From Swiss-Prot:
Its main location: cytoplasm. This is Ribosomal protein uS12 methylthiotransferase RimO. Keywords: 4Fe-4S, Cytoplasm, Iron, Iron-sulfur, Metal-binding, S-adenosyl-L-methionine, Transferase. SUPFAM superfamilies: Radical SAM enzymes. Its EC number is 2.8.4.4. The gene is rimO. It comes from the Bacteria. PANTHER family: RIBOSOMAL PROTEIN S12 METHYLTHIOTRANSFERASE RIMO, RIBOSOMAL PROTEIN US12 METHYLTHIOTRANSFERASE RIMO. [4Fe-4S] cluster 2 binds at residues 155, 159, 162. The lineage of its organism: Bacteria, Bacillati, Bacillota, Clostridia, Peptostreptococcales. One of its GO terms (cellular component) is cytosol. [4Fe-4S] cluster 1 binds at residues 11, 47, 81. Binds 2 [4Fe-4S] clusters. One cluster is coordinated with 3 cysteines and an exchangeable S-adenosyl-L-methionine.
Length: 444
């Protein structure tokens, strides 16, 4: 039987697609391996969101294509957003690719693999309105204690800078019962941290049920035995309701963590971005969250250098960040994407100015983060242990930190700790982003 290796690039939503492909292939008897040098088949699940992601995807494909000459590689399959967006270019420019599979076709990966024995090159770009369901097998690739739960696909927000609606289609929610069924299986498998994802989690349900139902969904997830942390990602500020805040406040196993991409704080730029909110509305929402959950962790992402961004627009953004003091913030220089409305806007910003503004904002955030971390010294936090880095020293995360994108805690312990266990840690030192502490005791 063929040996298959899969490389998934980009976001966690893309990773879930990769896990479904691996689940389908595993069920069909193919051998999944991690050694690309030994693989008969390599699948590259690509990202095509911004220029740097596209370049990473192309570089990865080209590097793997070399294994057709130097390794065991027989078939190279490209899936995901780059495949959906640039199928013809990939077919022409990289002839080593044997199959190009779009975002609405990955569920047919086993059939495509079988067809490749008869056809040299396949391009499969089916209807991108496909939504996976719980009946499709899934091969979880994350650590055994955590898993992603994708509750929807696509996006209908139509922000002017974003290509996702063209790559993934309009927003489609999964059925409520289907999500709960998958969540129960994940809990039974030993998952302790459940990370709820979609392009916009707060829009969940509006297309299927005529109203947003994230708060109801979280209530049902919170009642499932086994989940220690339930984390919600990608929540848009205009759809964070008081009802949702109260549900998060009510359940101890729902993290008081709000991943809320605001993108900007100048009303002029927000309008040009086609964001459905204003600076005043965002501030009111933040105050509503903090008045109900004083220790809530607020994470956001911001785009600087958007077309038409003046010095005054940027100053408004800086002032807003300094006023709000987000716990976590990622700033990105605007990436010009063809086939988006923003690409056609006048007054594009020079690359040097974009980078300078990004760096300025991140320096401000670094000081804010350091101030907030200093206040944590002497306090005790629940920490999920993720890795042992040396004798008696481990790294982990608090419930205020999402995997890979947020901060870590360096933990000292005289006793051996297990990866995936929760411990109580007293913080004794702090850096700009990370914390250090000692184990007080293990948690059940």
């Amino acid at each position: 039987m063929l040996k298959i290796a899969l490389e998934s690039l980009g976001c966690s939503k893309n990773l879930v697609d990769a896990e479904i492909m691996m689940g389908i292939l595993n069920n069909k008897g193919y051998k999944l391996i991690g050694d690309f040098e030994e693989a008969d088949v390599i699948i590259v699940n690509t990202c095509g969101f911004i220029e740097s992601a596209k370049q990473e995807s192309i570089d990865t494909i080209i590097n793997f294509a070399e294994l057709k000459k130097t390794g065991n590689l027989k078939l190279l399959i490209v899936t995901g957003c780059l495949a959906q967006r640039y199928s013809e270019e990939l077919k022409t420019e990289i002839p080593e690719i044997d199959a190009i599979v779009g975002t609405g076709s990955y569920q047919n990966i086993d059939k495509i693999l079988k067809e490749l024995s008869e056809i040299h090159q396949i391009v499969s770009l089916n209807d991108i309105e496909f939504v996976f369901n719980e009946d499709l097998p899934r091969y979880i690739s994350t650590p055994s204690y955590m898993a992603y739960l994708k509750i929807g696909e696509g996006c209908s927000n139509n922000c002017t800078y974003c290509i996702i609606p063209k790559l993934r289609g309009k927003y489609r929610s999964r059925k409520f019962e289907d999500i709960i069924k998958e969540a129960k299986k994940l809990a039974e498998s030993g998952v302790k941290e459940l990370v709820v994802i979609a392009q916009d989690t707060t829009k969940y349900g509006f297309d299927l049920y005529g109203k947003e139902r994230l708060s109801e969904l979280l209530e049902e997830l919170a009642k499932i035995d086994g989940f220690k942390w339930i984390r919600v990602m990608y929540s848009y500020p205009e759809s964070i309701t008081e009802e949702l805040i109260q549900v998060i406040k009510k359940y101890d196993n729902i993290c008081s963590y709000f991943d809320m991409p605001i993108q900007h704080a100048s009303n002029n730029i927000l309008k040009l971005m086609n964001r459905k909110t204003t600076k005043e509305d965002i501030l009111n929402k933040i105050n509503l969250i903090r008045s109900n959950i004083p220790d809530a962790i607020l994470r956001t992402t911001i785009i600087v250098g958007f077309p038409g961004e003046t010095e005054d627009d940027f100053k408004q953004l800086v002032d807003f960040v300094e006023e709000v003091k987000f716990d976590r913030l990622g700033a990105f220089a605007y990436s010009r994407e063809e086939d988006t409305p923003a690409d056609r806007l006048p007054n594009h910003i020079d690359e040097e100015v974009k980078i300078q503004r990004r760096d300025t904002l991140m320096m401000i955030q670094q000081k804010i983060s350091e101030e907030l971390n200093d206040k944590k010294i002497g306090k005790t936090y629940e920490v999920l242990i993720e890795e042992q880095i040396e004798d008696n020293v481990y790294t982990g995360r608090t419930q205020g930190d999402a995997e890979e994108i947020d901060s870590i805690v360096y933990v000292k312990s005289v006793d051996n700790l297990e990866v995936g266990e929760f411990v109580s840690v007293q913080i004794n030192d702090a850096m700009e982003y990370d914390l250090m502490g000692d184990v007080l005791y293990e948690l059940a």
